[in-house]
């Protein structure tokens, strides 16, 4: 589904954000990417759907080479859901309108079809009663659940999450993670950048640990939490799990 091969990413001539990164995400697999701040994990996930260009290597998404200049990136991005740290909802649109816009403009669905799909997804994330509200009327956790529903409305082949809970108050985190756990258990292909090790230990098939732009460890969940191979991963886990 997602193939990342020897990827390099530079910001200017002096800072290399990603260094020879190679990994993959199979169909139906949940892969968590973790690591300290500045390790390159958010950069990596943004490169998957070309929100950030790469300077070396290849990224293949469902058989399509992302970094090929001939690739229709808007069309490709429409097939991959992306949920950001900050919810990126349109503040001037009601919640149901946020869910309908891309369905109508990108997928060509009728307004009635889009509303039906959006309403079904709002029910799925527990927000049916908020369809006619504006984003500012919702809590951060509710807005993030709307963002997930909006991504799902496009019937994505995979979902990318870039620290989806890091901007939330602690009491709101679980409501977002619960939706993500349900998605994982339904077989959605997911690549998730997060510090939520409870989520990773519950649903991740594999865990990738990054540091200083490198993939230091790429292991099965049980191996990563049971006996990480690298000193850097061991120190990271001991620090995270001690809080």
What label would you give each PLM region?
Residues 216, 222-243:
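C-terminal boundary and immediately downstream tail of ABC-type ATPase nucleotide-binding domains
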């Amino acid at each position: 589904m997602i193939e990342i091969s020897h990827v390099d990413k530079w910001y200017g001539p002096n800072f290399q954000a990603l260094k020879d990164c190679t990994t993959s995400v199979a169909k139906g697999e949940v892969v968590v990417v973790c690591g300290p701040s500045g390790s390159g994990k958010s950069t990596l996930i943004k490169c998957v759907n070309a929100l950030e260009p790469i300077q070396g290597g290849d990224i293949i998404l469902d058989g399509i080479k992302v970094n090929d200049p001939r690739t229709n990136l808007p069309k490709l991005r429409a097939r991959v859901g992306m949920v950001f740290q900050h919810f990126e909802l349109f503040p001037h649109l009601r919640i149901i309108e946020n869910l309908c816009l891309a369905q109508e403009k990108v997928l060509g669905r009728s307004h009635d079809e889009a509303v039906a799909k959006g309403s079904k997804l709002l029910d799925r994330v527990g927000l049916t009663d908020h369809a006619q509200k504006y984003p500012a009327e919702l809590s951060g956790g509710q807005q993030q659940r709307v963002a997930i529903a909006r991504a799902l409305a496009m019937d994505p082949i995979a979902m990318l999450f870039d620290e989806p809970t890091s901007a939330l108050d602690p009491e709101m985190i679980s409501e977002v993670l619960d939706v993500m756990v349900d998605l994982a258990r339904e077989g959605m292909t997911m690549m998730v950048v997060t510090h939520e090790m409870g989520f990773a230990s519950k649903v991740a098939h594999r865990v990738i640990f990054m540091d200083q732009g490198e993939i230091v460890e790429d292991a099965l969940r049980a191996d990563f939490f049971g006996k990480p191979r690298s000193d850097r991963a061991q120190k990271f886990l001991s620090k995270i799990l001690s809080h």
